[in-house]
Amino acid sequence: MRVFILSPALGSDRIVTIRTENGVARVVWKGATPPSPGETNVELTLRGRLRWGTEVVPAPSGERAGIREDGSVVAAVDGVDSDGVARLRMPGEVVMIAPTGRQPPISVGDLVHVVGIEIDIYPENV
């Protein structure tokens, strides 16, 4: 995923501020060395408790896929495996999540909103 690093990870919490197509968000940098400000490609993971119907809900119509300023994510469902692992597609990125609970009726291409998470980013191809 292409992002613009606005502020490097200076503190022990390794929080960086990034700009995406959808706005500015604070995320956790997981690279070995702090990133330099500027445009870069990253991979991301979503961390936190994920439950269908609580943290993973249908997105309102008209939403665009991507990282939101509030730290949530909107993504298109790319598939759900028999073990419950869901593949979510955002511009330039596919993220795997394993929400618990009863899966609502969703289809490939439907948008979901994932809230109450922390987003970790890594340098691409690490």
Give a label for each model feature:
Residues 13-58:
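Acidic (E/D-rich), amphipathic helical modules within compact regulatory domains
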Residues 1-11, 61-83, 111-114:
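Structural detector for short beta-strands of small beta-barrel domains
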Residues 53-69, 124-126:
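Short, compositionally biased
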Residues 20-34, 90-108, 115-120:
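Beta-strand/loop nucleic-acid-binding surfaces
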Residues 28, 52-54, 85, 98, ...:
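Short acidic, gly/pro-rich beta-turn/loop elements at beta-sheet edges
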Residues 15-17, 41-43, 74-76, 87, ...:
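Beta-strand secondary-structure signal
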Residues 9-12, 17-24, 79-97:
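OB-fold (S1/OB) nucleic-acid-binding surfaces
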Residues 4-6, 37-50, 107-125:
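Flexible glycine-rich surface loops and low-complexity tracts that mediate binding to linear polymers
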